[in-house]
Amino acid sequence: MPKFYCDYCDTYLTHDSPSVRKTHCSGRKHKENVKDYYQKWMEEQAQSLIDKTTAAFQQGKIPPTPFSAPPPGGAMIPPPPSIPGPPRPGMMPAPHMGGPPMMPMMGPPPPGMMPVGPAPGMRPPMGGHMPMMPGPPMMRPPSRPMMVPTRPGMTRPDR
């Protein structure tokens, strides 16, 4: 009877049947071996790419990046518009420049104060309602009369 060999685990299974292979492949040790195998393979691929890039750069096949040396003749390359900086000649300053600064990030509220809005990274509650004012919650009237326990046979406890 042929045996099944697992390359990841470097072992033979008792026999070659789908149920034995399925049981083996769902095992903890097999999964760890597969993960380790591919992790080592990725590290080897990354190191190979680094080595090839380094060799090509040293041979002069890859030119140095344009930002690695100062521009010739004092020429200045303007930064992309997405990078904030001082306004360039002939440009209007952005609305946030020259005016009052935006509200800075604040730390946690003092004890007893409730923050307004959801915590950073949190979604608002399901209804989308946000608290209006910090402080204790407001009581709202019940939507229907409160249920008063009654004794069997009594329809109205106040009569």
From Swiss-Prot:
Residues 62-94, 140-159 are annotated as: Disordered. Residues 63-92 have a biased composition (Pro residues). A zinc finger (Matrin-type) spans 4-36. It comes from the Eukaryota. InterPro entries: Matrin/U1-C_Znf_C2H2, Matrin/U1-like-C_Znf_C2H2, U1-CZ_Znf_C2H2, U1_snRNP-C, Znf_C2H2_sf. GO terms for biological process: mRNA 5'-splice site recognition; spliceosomal snRNP assembly. Its main location: nucleus. Gene3D superfamilies: Classic Zinc Finger. Keywords: Metal-binding, Nucleus, Ribonucleoprotein, RNA-binding, Zinc, Zinc-finger. It is found in: Nucleus. GO terms for cellular component: Cajal body; commitment complex; U1 snRNP; U2-type prespliceosome. GO terms for molecular function: mRNA binding; pre-mRNA 5'-splice site binding; protein homodimerization activity; single-stranded RNA binding; U1 snRNA binding; zinc ion binding. HAMAP family: U1_C. Belongs to the U1 small nuclear ribonucleoprotein C family. Component of the U1 snRNP. The U1 snRNP is composed of the U1 snRNA and the 7 core Sm proteins SNRPB, SNRPD1, SNRPD2, SNRPD3, SNRPE, SNRPF and SNRPG that assemble in a heptameric protein ring on the Sm site of the small nuclear RNA to form the core snRNP, and at least 3 U1 snRNP-specific proteins SNRNP70/U1-70K, SNRPA/U1-A and SNRPC/U1-C. SNRPC/U1-C interacts with U1 snRNA and the 5' splice-site region of the pre-mRNA. Component of the spliceosomal U1 snRNP, which is essential for recognition of the pre-mRNA 5' splice-site and the subsequent assembly of the spliceosome. SNRPC/U1-C is directly involved in initial 5' splice-site recognition for both constitutive and regulated alternative splicing. The interaction with the 5' splice-site seems to precede base-pairing between the pre-mRNA and the U1 snRNA. Stimulates commitment or early (E) complex formation by stabilizing the base pairing of the 5' end of the U1 snRNA and the 5' splice-site region. This is U1 small nuclear ribonucleoprotein C. It comes from Gallus gallus (Chicken).
